[in-house]
A protein has these predicted regions:
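Fungal secretory targeting signals
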Residues: 1-20
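N-terminal module-boundary/linker segments of secreted carbohydrate-active enzymes
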Residues: 18-61
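Ligand-recognition surfaces built from glycine- and aromatic
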Residues: 23-30, 120-122, 215-252
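Secretory/extracellular carbohydrate-interaction modules
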Residues: 58-63, 67-164
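Short, surface-exposed beta-strand/loop "edge" segments at domain boundaries and coil↔beta transitions
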Residues: 82-93, 147-153, 172-177, 211, ...
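Short tryptophan-centered beta-strand motifs in secreted/extracellular beta-sheet-rich domains
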Residues: 125, 188-196, 201-203
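Short, aromatic/His-centered strand-loop micro-motif at the edge of beta-sheets
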Residues: 166-191
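Short strand-turn-strand beta-turns centered on an Asx-Gly dipeptide
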Residues: 204-208
Length: 252
């Protein structure tokens, strides 16, 4: 990845100031989706439908039943069905849950990418949750994913009570250590920053930063995921609205 690259950057303006979003466009007309592919809750078990970066981009890019523009304000809406045993939704290999989730790619090629945590690596999202699932910790809205281990190093959750937590796996085969990051009521905008920079993992909620232990992971190459990864026990559909999203890397 190029040094001092700023990827997928959109202005993080206050809610009342976000005037640039076009409600008539597909999400790709309002957000730089060149750095993302999209995993959907459709397809077959272990092989979900994936929309490539090139097909997401532009005002006439991909839109679908679970990934679309809010016609009132241009925000990106992502919905995900609940328990696949009830809803029949498709899951990725190694997962028991369904998702409408963005996965980081190389903007030059559209291929999957990862990065070293020794540099600067941040994911900043301004968003709100309209409906969280009824899983133990709620809907996963952001991940730092370890590439070689093919496991989430850190998953950030939003519960039906508005509690925001993060689960950090205690090594590639370890259980998650859960840390509470804050509380934001359903339907309320907030901004999170996931950072794995200078070999230090941290998450900020509305400016309140929590530094996290990475246990026995070492410093694996990782990539970001963001969106709506439903962890529910029932058929409850989760709904996430994204107002802005930015990925920044500096590998110098």
């Amino acid at each position: 990845m190029a040094p001092k690259s700023i990827i997928g950057l959109l202005s993080l303006l206050p809610v009342t100031a976000v005037l640039a979003l076009d409600p008539s466009c597909a999400p790709g007309g309002n957000f730089d989706l060149s750095v993302w592919s999209l995993q959907l809750p459709t397809g077959s078990a272990g092989k979900v439908d994936t929309i490539k970066s090139r097909d997401l981009q532009g005002c006439n890019g991909y839109t679908g039943p679970t990934f679309f523009t809010d016609k009132s304000n241009g925000e990106l809406i992502l919905t995900a069905p609940g328990n696949p045993d009830i809803t029949g939704c498709a899951t990725t290999s190694g997962s028991e849950h369904c998702r409408t989730e963005l996965r980081e790619v190389d903007p030059a090629t559209g291929q999957n990418t990862d990065w070293a945590p020794a540099g600067t690596n941040t994911l900043t999202v301004a968003m709100k949750v309209i409906q969280a699932d009824d899983g133990s910790h709620g809907t996963a809205i952001g991940q730092v994913f370890a590439a070689a281990a093919s496991k989430p190093l850190a998953e950030m959750y939003y519960s039906q009570k508005g509690d925001i937590t993060v689960g950090v796996k205690q090594g590639p085969s370890g259980n998650q250590a859960i840390t509470k990051l804050g509380t934001v009521p359903l339907g309320t905008y907030f901004t999170y920053i996931m950072s794995y920079s200078d070999d230090v993992l941290s998450i900020s909620i509305n400016g309140n930063k929590t530094t996290l232990d990475t246990f026995s992971w070492g410093t694996p190459n990782c990539y970001f995921k963001s969106g709506n990864y439903n962890q529910g026990k029932t058929a409850v559909t989760s709904e996430v609205h994204i107002q802005s999203i930015a990925v920044v890397h500096d590998q110098e």
